[in-house]
């Protein structure tokens, strides 16, 4: 449940099938061939409704929709014995490409909008993220940590924008999403 006091309450119901493997102690692979999410608005205040009506982007990003996706993650963590260890992770997600291929098999065009899954629109996007951190041991009881997180999401096909839950953000409860 995403609860933005004074604006909205959004629910996300999901389930997934995930396989995890460790090719080596320090290298991990995670593959999720089936992730199904349904995102819907439970409540919107009049103030938020006014904002949504003024912004086509918000209207699309906050609409009720299915998000059928697949995801693969690779992560590496250097040995704990190293004085200045690192952690690196790369994640690739895609949504609804197989579903859209099924629609194409029955005559729909890839670029057609308003295709549905269980009578609700579905999201279609490609997302790549990477996360890197390095720790420097300064003294016995103090460390300095550098952290970089980057990503890009591209909505296409059946979607104009990525779902709210897939957008990048900074901060906490009052975050900025882009």
Which residue ranges define each predicted feature?
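Transmembrane beta-strand segments of outer-membrane beta-barrel domains in Gram-negative
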Residues: 1-151
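Extracytoplasmic gating/loop element in the C-terminal half of outer-membrane beta-barrel translocons
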Residues: 143-178
């Amino acid at each position: 449940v995403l609860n933005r006091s004074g604006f909205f309450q959004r629910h996300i119901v999901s389930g997934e099938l995930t396989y995890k493997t460790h090719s080596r102690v320090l290298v991990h692979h995670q593959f999720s061939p089936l992730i199904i999410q349904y995102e819907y608005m439970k409540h919107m205040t009049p103030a938020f409704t006014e904002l949504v009506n003024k912004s086509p982007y918000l209207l699309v990003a906050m609409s009720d929709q299915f998000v059928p996706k697949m995801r693969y993650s690779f992560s590496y963590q250097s040995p704990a014995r190293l004085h200045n260890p690192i952690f690196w992770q790369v994640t690739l997600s895609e949504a609804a490409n197989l579903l859209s291929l099924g629609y194409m098999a029955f005559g729909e065009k890839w670029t057609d909008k308003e295709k549905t899954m269980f009578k609700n629109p579905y999201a279609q996007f490609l997302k790549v993220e990477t996360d890197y951190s390095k720790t420097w041991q300064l003294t016995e009881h103090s460390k300095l940590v550098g952290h970089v997180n980057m990503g890009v999401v591209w909505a296409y096909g059946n979607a104009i924008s990525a779902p709210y839950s897939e957008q990048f953000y900074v901060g906490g409860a009052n975050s900025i999403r882009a």
